[in-house]
């Protein structure tokens, strides 16, 4: 949670973070027109287009504002029928995009649709809304009509027929995406369930070695923006000025949001009537499965000297002396269970395909991931029967104050 500093005038401050954009994945066989379609939608040459099958290798992403939806990020993927050893690796990258896809565009072009139907089933299994597009020039549509009608019967929905090479393909695709927009994309907020207009909220934000000079970390920025959107009165302080900040206020804040690592300090000094939470806990609710995280925190008591814990960070950064995930949480666990307790750390999109060797997973707040991606990891943990919790939840549990915080 602490590794993503953003400065006042850099691109991160000007653009909506990808983590809160709607993720739209474009899938299909090689040479089905995926890249051509993306270029038509964005009205830019985002992806290289070639008659040679397999032009797209690693996924290509493009962030943009889509009228009627808002901030989105498109992913153009390698064909899922790619062949050979390199092809297998490309398909694995395509599978990774699947884990964070909110809406899928499945592009059809050939009469043999067996590959596409396998992926359609995979998308439906993951409960991902699917927009099926038949890419064909006008002159070729009659030839494919029987297959298109067969596809409509199999999917139970309308198949959008467009020519991806034409600019006019973008508008019907945009309208179809609006119809598929998941309700939670527009309804969920970070703090909206805890605050109302004119509430006073105090943010306690230690400016330690992990917060680069002149910057706030991304979870703090996103939370401040969310509070302002809800018409709250936002005050802020560092942990060492908490008492002075509280004394300066005319009334106790309704809510105090702190960095998880100073939970005990803030809990001890907060007014009795003020609610307490942390940025990490808020993001556990916003991005993950908060009930599973809370339930899984109890697994900390079941650890022993030979246990193995996986710590997962969404961002990639060089470890620092006060790093909460790489230093502080492992130190807390080893203080209780001994140095022989093994702690593995993964970052970015790295995540084990097999979790069976672990007794517990502790995930960061995932400010760099969208909710779909976090929940795909939670679902994997659930299916393998492995407890999974979150930095803030784990710290609150180990400090004995979990029942006193709000989420």
Language model segments and positions:
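Structural alpha-helical scaffold elements that stabilize or flank donor/cofactor-binding regions
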Residues: 90, 94-97, 194, 249, ...
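Canonical P-loop GTPase G-domain recognition
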Residues: 128-131, 136-193, 277, 387-397
């Amino acid at each position: 949670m602490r590794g993503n500093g953003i400065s006042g005038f850099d691109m991160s401050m000007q653009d909506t973070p990808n983590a809160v954009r709607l993720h739209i994945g474009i899938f299909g066989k090689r040479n089905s027109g995926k890249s051509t379609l993306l270029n038509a939608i964005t009205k830019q040459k985002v992806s290289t287009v070639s008659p040679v099958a397999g032009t797209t290798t690693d996924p290509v992403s493009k962030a943009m504002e889509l009228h009627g939806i808002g901030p989105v990020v498109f992913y153009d993927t390698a064909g899922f029928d790619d062949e050979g050893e390199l092809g297998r690796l490309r398909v694995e990258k395509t599978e990774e995009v699947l884990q964070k896809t909110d809406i899928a565009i499945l592009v059809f072009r050939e009469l043999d649709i067996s590959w596409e139907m396998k992926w359609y089933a995979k998308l439906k299994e993951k409960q991902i809304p699917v927009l099926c597009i038949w890419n064909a020039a006008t002159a070729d549509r009659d030839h494919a009509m029987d297959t298109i009608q067969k596809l409509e019967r199999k999917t139970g929905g309308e198949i959008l027929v467009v020519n991806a090479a034409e600019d006019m393909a973008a508008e019907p695709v945009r309208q179809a995406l609006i119809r598929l927009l998941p309700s939670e994309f527009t309804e969920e907020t970070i703090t909206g369930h805890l605050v109302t207009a004119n509430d006073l909220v105090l943010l306690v934000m230690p400016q330690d070695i992990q917060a680069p000079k002149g910057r706030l970390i991304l979870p703090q920025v996103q939370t401040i923006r969310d509070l302002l959107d809800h018409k709250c009165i936002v005050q802020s302080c560092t942990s060492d000025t908490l008492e002075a900040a509280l004394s300066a206020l005319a009334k106790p804040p309704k809510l105090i949001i702190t960095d998880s690592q100073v939970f005990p300090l803030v809990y001890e000094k907060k007014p009795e009537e003020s609610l307490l939470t942390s940025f990490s806990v808020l993001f556990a609710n916003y991005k993950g499965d908060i009930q599973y995280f809370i339930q899984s925190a109890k697994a900390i008591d079941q650890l022993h000297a030979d246990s193995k814990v996986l710590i997962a960070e969404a961002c990639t950064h060089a470890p620092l002396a006060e790093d909460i995930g790489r230093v502080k949480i492992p130190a807390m666990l080893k203080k209780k269970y001994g140095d022989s307790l093994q702690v593995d750390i993964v970052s970015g999109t790295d995540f084990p395909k097999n979790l069976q060797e672990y007794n517990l997973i502790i995930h960061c707040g995932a400010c760099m991931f969208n909710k779909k991606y976090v929940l795909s990891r939670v679902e994997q943990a659930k299916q393998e029967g492995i407890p999974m919790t979150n930095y803030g939840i784990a710290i609150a549990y180990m400090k004995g104050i979990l029942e006193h915080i709000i989420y």
